[in-house]
Amino acid sequence: MIMETESPLSITSPSPSDSTFQVDMEKTMHALPSSLLDSPLLSTNEHYPPKSTLLLSGPSPIRNIQLSATKSSESNSIDYLTDTQNIFPNFVNNENNYQFSTAPLNPIDACRVGERKVFTTGNVLLSADRQPLSTWQQNISVLSESPPQNGIQSYISSSEQAAQALTRKPSVTGFRSSSLNSNSDDIDIFSHASRYLFVTNLPRIVPYATLLELFSKLGDVKGIDTSSLSTDGICIVAFFDIRQAIQAAKSLRSQRFFNDRLLYFQFCQRSSIQKMINQGATIQFLDDNEGQLLLNMQGGSVLSILQLQSILQTFGPLLIMKPLRSQNVSQIICEFYDTRDASFALDELDGRIIHNCCLQVAYYDAMADSVSTSSASSLSVPRGFSGMLNNNSEWNNSMTMSSNQETPTAASCAVSRIGSSYGMSNNFGSVPLGRTESSPAWGTSGYYDVSSTSPVAPSDRNPSRQYNSIRYGLDVNPIAPPNSSRLKQRNSDLLNGINPQWSPFSSNTGKVFDSPTGSLGMRRSLTVGANASCSNPTNLSFASLTLHDSKADSTLSASSLNPDLNLQRYTPTVEKHASDRNSVDYAQIASGIDTRTTVMIKNIPNKFTQQMLRDYIDVTNKGTYDFLYLRIDFVNKCNVGYAFINFIEPQSIITFGKARVGTQWNVFHSEKICDISYANIQGKDRLIEKFRNSCVMDENPAYRPKIFVSHGPNRGMEEPFPAPNNARRKLRSIASAQQIGLFPPTASKC
């Protein structure tokens, strides 16, 4: 049943456990600004029957979770359940097991992924949406307390259901745009979907504000390039979410704009935009975050598929996840539909330790230059890694596998996709299969398709299904800020399985794990009590974990490395490539080639305050910047050694750099040398969007990001920071801060 409540809610577990997770909703709601309290997400109006999905959502099954409240009245959910089953006729309702829809996703419409309803045993209604108040600690602790049994682990619980799925044909007509005449039209267009729309036939005199208003109605717009609008009637629109980009494309095909004008569009790949930038175009919205993350797992254990999926889906819906290389299951690539979810996941998970496993996370660029070695064969994957890694087999469009089969082998996990881009779903001949009865495992040449919530495998070889692919070498460069705490001595380590500062358990007494060191010289450590089981990480509950900060020696000796690791695999070329990408070149700025405006100021004395930093910058650049944020370690109220500043004009970077870079700060007896590099997030608007829904805006005003007037007579004067505009992200940030602290000093956030 869906429960209507008039009192604070809490998430509890029926069975007593040391790791029971509770959220104080009353305290959380008081932390929200009044402007968000009227949000439909928080409304008790009967027009929003699945309102409990704000607390519990996500396609990953979580057992033994229920909503409890006082003074509650039950509302009848039978009609809603019936309506949902009418919408999804292939939905299987089994009272004993968790069930997912056995119908393959429509290959032309990824937007329906967020609409799929999932029901579980009991009275809790879950939806395939994100989990704002649930944290990844809750998910992993629940998995540890109640490891999935054979009957629960399988998303298709019986061989009969799997057999039915094999005979079911996916519908390709249900979500077709009204202006399309055939299924092949959708397939041709949306098989190459991306987050970028190349729109033509626009009026050449239309204002930028009008375009922004138009496309914002179709989805969350990341940016619009109008450099060719006045001459050719062309613009490039970037969306945060690829599903919204697809929906916007459908709207453009079925509607007319600007006095009955039909707009034409084409999906534009990131590589094409990068070529335009290389040829002198000024496109501000392109950055390293394409929703793709590279996760490297270090330590005594590797998280299972179910655990990783449960953790990652806490931050938002996943498009895909798979191993980086076929023989290494400790390096995983995942992609979120929404790039903002990827940024949030990176911020929260990088440097975290879960069950004797240290997670190192960085952005992954599938189009980056590969570093090939003669000792390893390259991997063939399509753009957006929507296809499948399989060095010894062709692309396939159909498969057969028994539901009670053992763990998939090297050739058992494969799938064919429509097109070579983001691959919204399985191909026509492909159907999702149930998980095996053995524990979840990565196929050595497979991946885990979270869109269909099940591994898939090939049976036939179909030469007609061959697709063009891009060859990648053994080592691929993850793009992140150079010389930051995340990338300093870590780019190549991350890709080659080396973590110089990671030490597994060595005894049964209290142990300390150190995550990578931040700029402050502080490192995030996690102590495990002696009562925790070290031999079996799945028995390790979060109740026995304690986070603390300790002084760390920033130097690295060879003896601190694991002797079992192969140090010869270190590839300085990868780190150099990332460093060159974000290094500041005054000549390129002066010539107008590099138009980036946001930089990271590094090596700041830790006792420096934000006001002191403003005074330091104003000596040479007063009134030339409109955003400033000195990141703070809220444990000791000191900065973490770096700040982010957005200059109004790129030429101001030259003025500041020539005056300050390479000089000492000459304060607090510090011998640090000022340095700068480009930040990942560029532009005042995008920086505001990143921080406006963050818990940091609830801290002391002296610790918050500051924005300033960019133009006009008041240029350089501080202006109010915009209020939050996303209730989910705000609630999620509050819950995360309650559990793991606010912005722990593990990595750079911009």
Curated annotation (Swiss-Prot):
One of its GO terms (molecular function) is RNA binding. PANTHER family: RNA RECOGNITION MOTIF-CONTAINING (PTHR23189). Coiled coil: none annotated. One of its GO terms (cellular component) is Tor2-Mei2-Ste11 complex. It comes from the Eukaryota. Residues 1-20 are annotated as: Disordered. Crucial for commitment to meiosis but it is not sufficient itself for the commitment. May be a splicing regulator. Residues 7-20 have a biased composition (Polar residues). GO terms for biological process: cell cycle switching, mitotic to meiotic cell cycle; meiotic cell cycle; negative regulation of conjugation with zygote; positive regulation of meiotic cell cycle; positive regulation of metaphase/anaphase transition of meiosis II. Residues 195-270, 293-361 form the RRM domain. The keyword RNA-binding applies. Binds rad24 when phosphorylated. The keyword Iron-sulfur does not apply. This is Meiosis protein mei2. The gene is mei2. Keywords: Meiosis, Phosphoprotein, Repeat, RNA-binding, Stress response.
